[in-house]
């Protein structure tokens, strides 16, 4: 554990210590000197007051179960800054609370990363108005069941990638008050939040965002998600954005501006609850990778991809693999002249009866027919007019 703080009082608690072997917690008064405290069985409170002329405090110890940082009467901790991606508490910590008034947080990237034992976290005293980077902040905090960030000021934050990735114990998360107007990276922001049943991101300002890859990947418990107001005009990567959101039955992405997107691979892979998708208005002129895009979308019966500009696409392998309920597919206007990989494109599409290919040139039509044969899909009518 590393907790760095120009402070005068630090209180911390060590609990759940068993056995007779003394355990050591070190308190560093500066970078070179330290005080060792031996902790035996039982739950104990400790307080260490730094001299006024000491500007740095670091606590370290693998046995720490609970951390409380608060201000004393005369002095209060004001800045919390971990050493370069260092956590301020170890993975064994169960509870952490930061109650100092007006705690000014400056650098919190990765600050609770991999704290898998953490069940309770009180950040009510944090002033986040100067924070620019929240990357990996709570990543793999798998035991957290609740988190109140409703009063946070995120107006200066530019990076939220991986922020809640792996928080599988959370069933709900209120981020509706987040100001995301400066955020450029939301990659894996809610990835692997497998316990989330609801998530309101409808008020997110995404006008600056360039990366949304795996943003909601493996949010397997989400039954609804409103992203219809997302401004995606600057997004370049949407790979795996909704991958394995298997309980989503409806998703409106028809208004997405995809004019700058190059990667859509795995975007809806495993979204087995979706029954239809209308992506006919998407600008795919810069897209090169769409492999596995709909693989495992076993609930899809209709898919409209007409009008797509696929002239720059190179990889289409497994795109519709295991879309077992798909009966019709509209690929009107497609151009596969630059495609180098179509492996298993239609494998498992056992219900497919027609593909609309109006406006497609003969080489593209021939490629599609050949791939249907390779994937052992028979009885499909190609409609060209």
What are the roles of these predicted feature ranges?
Residues 2-385:
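Negatively charged
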């Amino acid at each position: 554990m590393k907790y760095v703080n120009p402070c005068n009082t630090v209180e911390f608690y060590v609990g759940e210590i068993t056995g007779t072997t003394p355990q050591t917690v070190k308190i560093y008064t500066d970078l070179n000197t330290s005080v060792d405290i031996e902790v035996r069985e039982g739950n104990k409170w400790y307080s260490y007051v730094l001299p006024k002329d000491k500007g740095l405090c670091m606590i370290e110890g693998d046995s720490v179960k609970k951390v409380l940082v608060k201000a004393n009467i005369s002095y209060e901790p004001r800045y919390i800054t971990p050493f370069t991606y260092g956590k301020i508490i170890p993975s064994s910590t169960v509870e952490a609370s930061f109650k100092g008034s007006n705690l000014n947080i400056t650098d919190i990237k990765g600050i609770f990363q991999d704290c898998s034992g953490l069940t309770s976290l009180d950040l009510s005293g944090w002033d986040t108005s100067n924070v620019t980077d929240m990357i990996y902040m709570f990543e793999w905090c798998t035991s957290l069941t609740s988190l109140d960030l409703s009063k946070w000021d995120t107006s200066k934050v530019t990076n939220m990638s991986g922020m809640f990735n792996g928080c599988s114990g959370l069933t709900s998360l209120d981020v509706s008050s987040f100001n995301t107007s400066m955020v450029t990276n939301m990659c894996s922001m809610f990835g692997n939040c497998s316990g989330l049943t609801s998530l309101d991101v409808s008020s997110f300002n995404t006008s600056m965002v360039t990366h949304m890859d795996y943003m909601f990947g493996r949010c397997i418990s989400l039954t609804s998600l409103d992203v219809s107001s997302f401004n995606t005009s600057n997004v370049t990567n949407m790979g795996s954005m909704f991958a394995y959101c298997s309980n989503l039955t409806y998703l409106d992405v028809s208004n997405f501006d995809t004019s700058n997107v190059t990667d859509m691979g795995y975007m809806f892979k495993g979204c087995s609850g979706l029954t239809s998708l209308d992506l006919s208005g998407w600008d795919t002129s810069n897209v090169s990778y769409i492999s596995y895009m709909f693989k495992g979308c076993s609930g899809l019966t209709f898919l409209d991809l007409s009008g797509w500009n696929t002239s720059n696409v190179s990889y289409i392998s497994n795109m519709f693999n295991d879309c077992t309920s798909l009966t019709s597919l509209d690929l009107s206007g497609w151009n596969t002249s630059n495609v180098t990989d179509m492996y298993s494109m239609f494998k498992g599409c056992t219900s497919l009866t027609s593909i609309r290919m109006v406006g497609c040139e003969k080489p593209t039509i021939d490629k599609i027919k050949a791939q249907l044969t390779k994937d052992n899909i028979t009885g499909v009518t190609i409609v060209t007019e």
